[in-house]
Curated annotation (Swiss-Prot):
It comes from Streptococcus agalactiae serotype V (strain ATCC BAA-611 / 2603 V/R). The gene is rpsB. SUPFAM superfamilies: Ribosomal protein S2. This is Small ribosomal subunit protein uS2. The keyword Transferase does not apply. Belongs to the universal ribosomal protein uS2 family.
Length: 256
């Protein structure tokens, strides 16, 4: 049984690609048709490939993989943080800092600084410092938490990276590829799929679409860690809709 049904994908707007003039020809095989100047993603392929992504992430999690969720644009930031936390994993949902993976030693030093500032406050050191210095420390902590808070407790560079919009997160993808870290990604019609190991053709600009896909991969982590099915209920929906119905509902745009 599919982990995500055609009906769920349709309702979340996963089928809406970008304007045809913005497409990447390498995504042609994942495109079903074009309507009103918008490419329509072939959701039959999305259903199958989402299954493959789920299995890949579940199996990795079962082997204690460290999984990093990445999505820094506003449509993705909240879902990426929430679902990574729910799965007990790690995330980056603000700007990707160049060298986050390839210069992990330096990043660890910044994380150590973040933990040091937190410890200073917890131990009461702030009460002994001038207000101006405390203000500077709080400002530094806020900035470090913004960019590194989601990986503060990540024990090592990730074994798997999940990306929302690899077109935007090109630096992150390149760092992962350089280090041999497999990348699972939501790939829209404007992106280059070549550097993605496990592709999920999907609208990566709609909040509902991002939430749907990201939550299912979080479920995969949970299932892998627990050795049992995550809490999903889609059995009656999975075969409810056909690809032909997509044409009838494509009247929207690539936004939530």
């Amino acid at each position: 049984m599919a982990v995500i049904s055609m009906k769920q994908l349709l309702e979340a707007g996963v089928h809406f690609g970008h304007q045809t003039r913005r497409w990447n020809p390498k995504m042609a095989k994942y495109i079903f048709t074009e309507r009103n100047g918008i490419h329509v993603i072939d959701l039959q392929q999305t259903v199958k490939l989402a299954d493959q992504a789920y299995e890949f992430v579940r199996d990795a999690a079962a082997n204690d993989a460290v999984i990093l969720f990445v999505g820094t644009k506003k449509q993705a930031a909240e879902a990426v943080a929430e679902e990574a936390k729910r799965a007990g994993q790690y995330f980056i949902n603000h700007r990707w800092l160049g060298g986050t993976l390839t210069n992990w030693g330096t990043i660890q030093k910044r994380i150590a600084r973040l933990k040091e500032i937190k410890r200073m406050e917890e131990e009461g050191t702030f009460e002994l410092l001038p207000k101006k210095e405390v203000a500077l420390l709080n400002k530094q902590r806020a900035r470090l938490e913004k960019f590194l808070g989601g990986i503060e407790d990540m024990p090592r560079i990730p074994d798997v990276m999940y990306v929302v919009d690899p077109h935007k997160e090109q630096i992150a993808v390149k760092e992962a590829k350089k280090l041999g870290i497999p990348v699972v990604a939501m790939v829209d019609t404007n992106a280059d799929p070549d550097d993605i190991d496990v592709i999920i053709p999907a609208n990566d600009d709609a909040i509902r679409a991002v939430k749907l896909i990201t939550s299912k991969l979080a479920d995969a982590v949970i299932e892998g860690r627990q050795g049992e099915d995550a809490d999903v209920d889609f059995a009656q929906e999975a075969q409810a809709d056909s690809i032909e119905e997509i044409v009838e509902v494509v009247e929207g745009s690539n936004n939530d």
